[in-house]
């Protein structure tokens, strides 16, 4: 990359960044937080944050990168995608209804507590089983790629670990005070560190827990935008340190700075992967919707499907194995736009942008319903579900549509099963006569009738 090429690329990058950043900031000032703001920040991080890091690697360390023309295509496609997404998100297909909707379900105190307990048990039990089978992998494996080898058993259990976070979210939304906020941080980060050590370097739970803590603080007004930026810098440094431990790296001086640049870029902003995919566009045999179906294979136990393929050819694996001919053991993320290109080429980019706009709009609709819900227990469940889906939106932006669809369906299924089990347990307790009236104490000798609620569990 020459300085002239860098100058032209920088102008295009600056226009795209300012475009996305301006729309995001306007939305932030209007609502402080919704899922459009979250997705937009995540989108900026994924497709724009890595450009300065790439330039530093090129000019400071003479690192070879994708040809400039494909870097340009990556920036242009990212900006065009966001423009279409934003129009899709803001377009209202029907008039706003002024009549209240009929409630689909209701929640009481016991059902809500049973729900978060079941969600937490799903995570804790699966972590325990994984530990009994493998021990502390962080101290046993020589390289991170060994996590995906046949030597590690029960890999599918890792998908259940995340449910500890929505469980703690429900606990927080029942109280919504500073004490509950810090309890959420302490509990989820501690659990994330535990899974980091057991699984052998997986940082997802720590990143998500810290991110949710910050966004809850933004929503409640407990932290400012500048505090969020400072916390983001702290988070980047923390993730770099964890990455050094995960890959057993011991670096110092210029090598440490070089390692920081490429690890931070690959962790938070794999935008060069999109440029690399576009460079190999002629090698792609468009997969259609098959990667979405294939990504569900990992959720099917081998005892239920004896002939299940050992390898899943989703868009990430197709990009890694078929396009790049890379068989190192790690899948290279194609990003959201890259997954659309693998499935249907450039024509799938605007179609995907429209669909993503509708998906984010649905999450915002559900989130607003939770905020306006008068039943505090139902509100906690709805908001816990929405914030719990943050991981799936991260997967959408970073890994692609196919991974998002399979994970969001899995998340909804497990969350729904726990909710139904909680209602079933409540019905059984009530039938057995274990549910008694919960009488709230009052300073007066005769408490008012409203202080009696039939939702206590002895």
UniProtKB/Swiss-Prot annotation:
The chain crosses the membrane at residues 3-23, 37-57, 65-85, 112-132, 154-174, 180-200, 201-221, 222-242, 340-360, 377-397, 409-429. Keywords: Cell inner membrane, Cell membrane, Membrane, Transmembrane, Transmembrane helix. One of its GO terms (cellular component) is plasma membrane. It is a multi-pass membrane protein. It comes from the Bacteria. The keyword Transmembrane helix applies. Disulfide bonds: none annotated. It is found in: Cell inner membrane. Its main location: membrane. Pathway: Bacterial outer membrane biogenesis; enterobacterial common antigen biosynthesis. InterPro entries: WzyE. GO terms for biological process: enterobacterial common antigen biosynthetic process. Probably part of a complex composed of WzxE, WzyE and WzzE. HAMAP family: WzyE. Probably involved in the polymerization of enterobacterial common antigen (ECA) trisaccharide repeat units. Belongs to the WzyE family. This is Probable ECA polymerase. It comes from Serratia proteamaculans (strain 568). The lineage of its organism: Bacteria, Pseudomonadati, Pseudomonadota, Gammaproteobacteria, Enterobacterales.
